[in-house]
Amino acid sequence: MKQMVFENFYQHETDVYSLEGFSPVIVDRAYLEKLGVTVHASEETYAKLEAGSRVFMERWKNRTVLPVQHLVLEDLVPEEVDTEIHNYTGRCPTLTFEINPVKGCNVGCQYCLVTDGVHEQQLVAYENYHLYVRYLLKEMNGTPTREVTAEELRRKDGLLKELAQCIEKNPAGKKDIERRITEVSRGKNWNHYYYFSPKTEALQEPTLRTGIAHRILKEFIRHYEEYPDSNARLFVASKAGAKHLLCEYEGETILDLFCQLKDKMQYNVSVSIMPDAFRDILEPYAAPIEERLKAVRLCREKGIPAEAALVQPIFTPYLTPEHIRSFFDRLRAEGIINYKPEFLTACMENLAMLGQILGHFDKDLERALYEDYIMPENSDHKKQRGRTAPDRALSIDNIRRMMDYTKQIGMSTSICYWVRKQLRIGNDLIPIINENGFQCLGYQSKLFKNQ
């Protein structure tokens, strides 16, 4: 087993350990009442907030809140990897396969959708993950040897309907249906996105300093050379900064490799709406916003599609008209024409940590944050793994307020099916495929030659 210690490309001056005057507290009923929270939560919610506070207190004391820069390198058997479909709803527009070469994440986001902000697990990267990517691309999007039958199309559509029902009623059965969908997709060269990387940061130190990211991109280049009619498309969503894109391995940078994929890929920047000082604490090893937008600029200067943003998480109390204008003006100035908004979703244990860190900077924002999430009537507004979203009426109002402004500056909006269903957003407000060709997470439908 190989191991390595690495240096980060970016690191903020202050982190959760060195934040002047901060130490964790217990968020319970008494704390919320003293803060001025007028919403009365359920006993279960109070218990989870208190439990999360105690866990955070222990992790802060033991200095295990942030990931450590220690990496274990392993190999895998490409044919034995369990192919994952990126689909939380069963209604995603195109079958999307996940590329996840790292277990854990070095960026260390304290609101992480995958780990609920816990980064204590060992970072593990698979050095030969590119061989799995080669195998998957060939199996799914190598030139088909025969025409697809109507029965196969019906079978795929039927399995997707089963998947949608399973996710809602029997999540434990999701894997089995995904395997069947993968099997029926094999050898068909259907339209597929390959998402690099939904469960971790694609362009982080463990993938860059080892060359793993470079090798994965080279596999896509190799695939298109061998199969020029392939309907595989690469989707990269990232918090990377310019330094990440310019990281060189064996004589080539990530940007060099992107240039060879420019008509087969898209690069979507991931940015959040929250106070800057708060963001520095919550995203300890992510590139600053100005560096992420510089990465967008580098892509666009080279003709690489980089016109969409994942705007997440959005902290609702911070979403004032002034902040809406300044945030989206900044994106639009860099050529961003589409955004996918998503409000913070958090389990109550994680919310207790996020709330008190926010309160260190602004107690009014902390109070508003709890009030947006903990009311009993909002307890069923949950995403996967029990993560609570903000009040539905507030969410709809905030989406409309963002859209009212972004339409004025020529930006379109796309949303995932889960948000569409939960908030009952119709095609009249946000079309499935919008005027700029974007859908769902910000997938660009125009990347496929048959659309």
Language model regions located:
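Domain-start "cap" segments at the beginnings of catalytic or binding domains
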Residues: 85-86, 95-118, 152-153, 272-274, ...
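Flexible, acidic/Gly-rich N-terminal and inter-domain linker regions that tether
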Residues: 1-98, 103, 107-111, 119, ...
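Acidic/polar N-terminal loop/beta-strand segments that form early-domain functional surfaces
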Residues: 102, 114-117, 126, 151, ...
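A structural signal for well-ordered alpha-helical segments within the folded catalytic domains
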Residues: 107, 214, 397-400
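Hydrophobic, aliphatic-enriched repeat segments that assemble into extended interaction scaffolds
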Residues: 105-114, 129-140, 321, 325-345
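Conserved AdoMet/S-adenosylmethionine-binding subsite of the radical SAM
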Residues: 161-394
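Auxiliary Fe-S-binding modules of radical SAM enzymes
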Residues: 2-41, 46-47, 294, 298, ...
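Conserved alpha-helical substructure of the radical SAM core
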Residues: 115-191
